[in-house]
Amino acid sequence: MLLTVDVGNTNTVLGLFDKERLVQSWRVKTDPRDTADELWLLYRSLIDGFELTGLAVCSTVPAVLRELRTMISHYLSDIPTTIIEPGVKTGVPLLVDNPKEIGADRIVNTLAAHSLYGKNGPCIVVDFGTSTNLDVVSPKGEFLGGALAAGIEISVDALAQRAAQLRKVELVVPRSVIGDRKSTSELQSHVRI
């Protein structure tokens, strides 16, 4: 089975695939202080009972990627591994001024979007994470660029800190996209939009 690891600034998402079928997935907090051994203890507990045939990793957190490399070399050295990072050939042309600045997550998203949806025309990929990424993919599967903005949680936190009459609210999906004239539900509507 193929274990995929997507290390984001806030969460790490792991998926276990049998060919193209997702068998299991997990979402865990990303902690850049974790050591290779701590990562292995966590990953081993999740994949226990599954036979790994491959590993694919992308990370936007250099400290975690460094520890993942160590973990892989110590505990999974016999498993074929692909780490998406600048310089790795993915088949995605990066038509931007500095391709090395494009995060691995955005490259993988481009590849997936084109494979799944892009054969008939261009597409826009929206990734709601610590930052909200909007990326444009050409009909040929080329990464054309995009826009980055603060993610939902950061936006809500910033509003609570910078707007005198707004407070931090729990990020839950409200009943309606239109808030019910209370600032709490109006801020939560941000999640729905």
Region annotations inferred by a language model:
Residues L2-D6, A56, C123-D127:
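Short glycine-aspartate micro-motif
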Residues L2-E51, E142-R167:
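Short glycine-rich, Thr/Ser-proximal phosphate-binding strand/loop in the N-terminal lobe
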Residues N11, S59-L65:
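Glycine-rich phosphate-binding loops at beta-strand->alpha-helix junctions
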Residues E51-V61, P80-I83:
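Short glycine-rich phosphate-binding loop at a beta-alpha junction
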Residues E67-Y75:
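Short, aromatic/basic amphipathic alpha-helical patches
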Residues D78-T82, V88-R162:
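Phosphate-binding/catalytic loop of phosphoryl-transfer enzymes
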Residues Q161-S185:
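A mobile "lid/hinge" subdomain adjacent to the ATP/sugar-phosphate binding pocket shared
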Residues E186-I193:
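Single conserved hydrophobic/aromatic residue that forms the stacking wall/gate
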